[in-house]
Amino acid sequence: MAPLPLDDANMPLFTVGQVSEMLEVQQAFLRRLDEFRVVRPSRSAGGQRRYTRNEIVAVRYVVELMDDGLTLAAIRRVLELETKVRQLEAERDALRAELARLAAGA
């Protein structure tokens, strides 16, 4: 049986209104996050923003950072750096695995 779209955390299912209600934020705030390239939801065929569960988690994180006093520009940079760290950690892990494989074969 194929998984339901609700099982996919990356499936864009939720509208701006739904996310606004879930997180108790203004719809204008969500649009601003998109405009500032902080959280960029995909668009429906009709051009409406659609949020994934992962993007909703990201919006919640952004709200926490704003509550701590960060600006949207600073938050965007934090998110970029966190993404870069995850990429570098994955690369490091792949290199460690390759070294272990080479050492085992030596």
Which residues does each predicted region cover?
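Arg/Lys-rich, alpha-helical DNA-contact motif
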Residues: 2-12, 21, 35, 40-41, ...
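Short, Lys/Arg-rich nucleic-acid/phosphate-binding segment
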Residues: 43-49
